[in-house]
Amino acid sequence: IIVGTGTCGIAAGARESLRVLLDELTARGIDADVAEVGCIGMCYNEPLVDVVTDDGEKSTYGHVKVEDVSKIVKEHVIGGQPIEDLLVPQDGFFDRQVRVVLENCGIIDPESIDEYMSKGGYKALKTALTEMSRQQVIDKITASGLRGRGGAGFPTGVKWGFVAREPGPEK
């Protein structure tokens, strides 16, 4: 069971729904994996709760109120029957989206460095620190086209090149 607890979910009441969910599972003696994830990407449907079955079938519930939680546990988690009137319609919202930077958003716990690393997080940093020279890093950043966010969009690799050529240990 996945509960979106990004700022949008929290503002919509996700923490309360999560608390009631955990209490409900405990009271019924259900040993389910419950994960908190960052924003799932449908802020307008928060709080969002995904129920994923053992065979990988995912049902997404939207606008989950505290009073809906018991019904979701009883009918879906225990009974195996999704509650149609609480499900988020499959309208193709995500179909044409390609997530790059935020590909794991709504999938992993944003407060778990281990989950981030299990998805390849910090791999590029490790490579830069252990396998590349300073100039190779600058060349890679330059080739990427990465630009600053200060308004002018100045090329980051060019800036790093300027700084690297300056004398002295502090940059």
Regions found by a protein language model. Give the residues of each.
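Feature of Fe-S/electron-transfer and energy-metabolism proteins
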Residues: 1-171
